Amino acid sequence: MRQLRILGIVGSPHVKGLTSELVAEALGGAASLGPGTETVSLAEQGIIHCDDDHSECWSDGVCRRSEAATALSRKLDEFDAVVLGAPVYYLDVNGLTKNFMDTTRTLNTNGKPALGISLAGGTGKGLTSTLRSIYNFFFCIELRGIDPLPVSRFNYKKALSQAYSSGRKLAELCKRRQPFESLSERIAYYHGLKYLNYDIVDENLLLAQQLIQNIEASGDAKALLEEAIREYSEAKELVGQGKKTEAVVHIMNSYEAGTKAWDIQNH
């Protein structure tokens, strides 16, 4: 019986950075159930931008500008599942990842399971908008995306555990590939995935939540955490009432108090 294989793609320019660690954790979870794994770092591939000048690439899967792009497309065709991790630049995927996406021309990916991970350093902003870009890519090449994973410095440790669990789930799912039968089925499936319908208000509320859930504060940080929790609760109630615009000030108050508490706790 052929061994199943899962491909990990690291979109960060840092070959051994935090994005790489998250992808490695997901592959480790998959490997624990038997599949083989392989990691590709986009920083080492030299994939250049698409010039949209060779329409035949859509039918034959060959990029005329980049052999590396063609080789990676064939890996996506050959492997049984994929993990794609990307850092956040300007609330979106970085250029390395975007060049990879734009030059991908797959011929055999319908229904293969895929896990996307976004990593937003610093403020954490862009963690769900970047996930949306990753899963839009999965949608376009007919992968069956699972478990969108938004990661910031505030939930990084927990995210490693989530990545491992999702990797195990990938290993199980790739045993029984489920191709989409129609475009309408694919749209309905992706519409139901968590985080993909988040707007900028939802995203910042999520960041405030990540802060609150991952701070164990004492001293000066404790009062700030309590303030963050109060403001978050007010924001959550307003969002639930459909008053997102009114909620924004409370979301940002919660976030600002939470980040101050975080910085005190971690320095």
PLM region spans:
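Short helix-terminating capping/connector loops at secondary-structure junctions
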Residues: 1, 109-110
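Short, glycine-/small-residue-rich phosphate/pyrophosphate-handling segment
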Residues: 110-162
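N-terminal beta1-alpha1-beta2 submodule of the flavodoxin-like/Rossmannoid cofactor-binding fold
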Residues: 1-101, 164, 170-171, 175, ...
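Phosphate/oxyanion-binding loops and surfaces in catalytic or ligand/nucleic-acid-binding neighborhoods
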Residues: 107, 141, 173
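A mobile, often basic/glycine-rich helix-loop segment
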Residues: 102-106
